[in-house]
């Protein structure tokens, strides 16, 4: 018997729909209807403070990802961070902070989430595309 996962749903959720390389400062977007699901840093990398990491959040269901801009939410604050409510709720956590250009992601690290746009300020990376 062979055991393993042979699911396109799992594959599509983990970057098997392609990847894109960036070593400049131009914003990049995934194909229509897709998102970036992981970013591997090839050099120390920073993201633009304004729209550097635009997360595909679904805060109604507790799905929030690190990013630079958040236009949600239940506490009435427009641009706060993922999981940064005054106190934890059934769907939202507390204590998260917004990523800005002062946050350096070191070479070799991979971050996971769902982003609709990536705008680097410095460094180089590979972004993986998923559903």
Regions found by a protein language model. Give the residues of each.
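Beta-sandwich interaction modules
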Residues: 13-31, 91-116, 125-130
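Intrinsically disordered, low-complexity, compositionally biased regions/tails
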Residues: 8, 17-22, 28, 37, ...
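Solvent-exposed interaction patches of small proteins and small membrane subunits
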Residues: 44-56, 125-129
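Surface-exposed intrinsically disordered loops and tails
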Residues: 54-98
């Amino acid at each position: 018997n062979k055991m393993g996962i042979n699911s396109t749903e799992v594959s599509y959720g983990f970057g098997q729909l392609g990847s894109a390389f960036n070593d400049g400062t131009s914003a990049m977007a995934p194909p229509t209807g897709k998102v970036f699901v992981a970013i591997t840093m090839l050099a120390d990398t920073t993201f633009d403070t304004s729209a550097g990491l635009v997360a595909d959040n679904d805060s109604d269901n507790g799905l929030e990802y690190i990013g630079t801009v958040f236009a949600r939410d239940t506490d009435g604050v427009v641009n706060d961070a993922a999981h940064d409510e005054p106190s934890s709720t059934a769907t939202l956590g507390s204590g998260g902070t917004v990523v800005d250009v002062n946050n350096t992601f070191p070479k070799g690290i991979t971050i996971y989430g769902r982003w609709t746009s990536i705008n680097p300020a410095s460094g180089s990376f590979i972004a993986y595309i998923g559903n």
